[in-house]
From Swiss-Prot:
Alphabetized InterPro entries for the sequence: PRibTrfase_dom, PRTase-like, Pur/Pyrimidine_PRTase, Xanthine_PRibTrfase
Protein name: Xanthine phosphoribosyltransferase
Gene3D superfamilies: 3.40.50.2020
Residues that bind 5-phospho-alpha-D-ribose 1-diphosphate: A128, H129, G130, E131, A132
Localization terms from the record: Cytoplasm
Reactions performed catalytically: XMP + diphosphate = xanthine + 5-phospho-alpha-D-ribose 1-diphosphate
Organism of origin: Lactobacillus acidophilus (strain ATCC 700396 / NCK56 / N2 / NCFM)
Metabolic or biological pathway, per its Swiss-Prot or TrEMBL entry: Purine metabolism; XMP biosynthesis via salvage pathway; XMP from xanthine: step 1/1
Protein role: Converts the preformed base xanthine, a product of nucleic acid breakdown, to xanthosine 5'-monophosphate (XMP), so it can be reused for RNA or DNA synthesis.
Glycosyltransferase as UniProt keyword: yes
Gene that this polypeptide is encoded by: xpt
Lineage top rank: taxon: Bacteria
EC number: 2.4.2.22
Quaternary context: Homodimer.
Amino acid sequence: MKLLEERIKRDGEVLDGNVLKINSFLNHQVDPKLMMEVGKEFKRLFAGEQIDKVLTCEASGIAPGVMTAYQLGVPMVFARKKKPSTLNDAVYWADVFSYTKKVNSKICVEEKFLHEGENILIIDDFVAHGEAVKGMVNIAKQAHCNIVGVGAVVAKTFQGGSDWVKDEGLRFESLASIASFKDGQVHFEGEE
């Protein structure tokens, strides 16, 4: 998605450890117009698929997830990183490792929001090593849902998460696929 790639090049900051900081439009402050375009693009990419629900993970997955769900006309559910006191005990759990925070944690979705046989589209803000996606796939499988595919706003394809998704036999679509970081610059797949 050219618009997204241009925004990453303009406003993104490459940090040590192959981390891309895009806090000005996705991971802290959100650009709703850009996220609406993200939702439209995921709708276009997954056209023809029967999708009943979008599954994402809090917090940065919510903006692209809700815009995608809005475009598709379906509900969105997000996996929580902590179980609030208002959640009952009927919960699907999965372990995830945060690449940027360097901590293991659990994510959860209340069972009443995922139903056997539902067609689920997983949307994530970043897919690097794919830990959050692995957790969401695990939760969708616990609920006996059909996973239509995984959509990443940004994929760092050199870190293996997108390969894991494909190795699981799942469709993977990324709106901005990063091949490498060199000299503090982002290099997208297909660039010279």
